[in-house]
């Protein structure tokens, strides 16, 4: 899956650029969203901070315990996106973070509001990040699917028990 990108430097650079742009967009939007909540919907502020934080910690601990090798370790091939981390592949914390931020914006925003549409855009960006992480050889498909499932379960629990 990574061969076309490892064999074509321009394609690899474009893939890395897509990864950086999507990641930066998600992780710049989140603090702007939290800042916006400080001035408008304070009742959702704590939830919007706690949900991603708790999930991030839980996924980090889970990854440490599982310590699954990454594709570039297992298949002894260089990743397309520079990465030298060993183990801790499942679930993808990068993808989990993008999805839980997107889901948090969705569940804490009124339906069909501009913020809700921002949540939809963030979900699309998270999906692109997931694809790029697999195509670049830094995660298995199951790593990014697992990250999505972890984020979806956390968002569901928050929706059922806290909203």
Q: What is each stretch, according to the model?
A:
Residues 35-36, 59-67, 106, 158-163:
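Membrane-water interface at transmembrane helix exits
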Residues 1-30, 59-87:
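N-terminal transmembrane-helix/juxtamembrane module of multi-pass inner/ER membrane proteins
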Residues 76-163:
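Membrane-embedded catalytic cores of phosphoryl/pyrophosphoryl-handling enzymes
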Residues 27-37, 123-127:
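Hydrophobic core of alpha-helical transmembrane segments in multi-pass integral membrane proteins
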Residues 1-3, 40-44, 64-69, 88-100:
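Hydrophobic alpha-helical transmembrane segments
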Residues 33-58:
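Interfacial segments of alpha-helical transmembrane regions
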Residues 39-42, 67-72, 137-142, 163:
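Transmembrane helix-loop junctions in multipass membrane proteins, especially transporters and channels
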Residues 51-63, 125-133:
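Alpha-helical transmembrane segments of multi-pass membrane proteins
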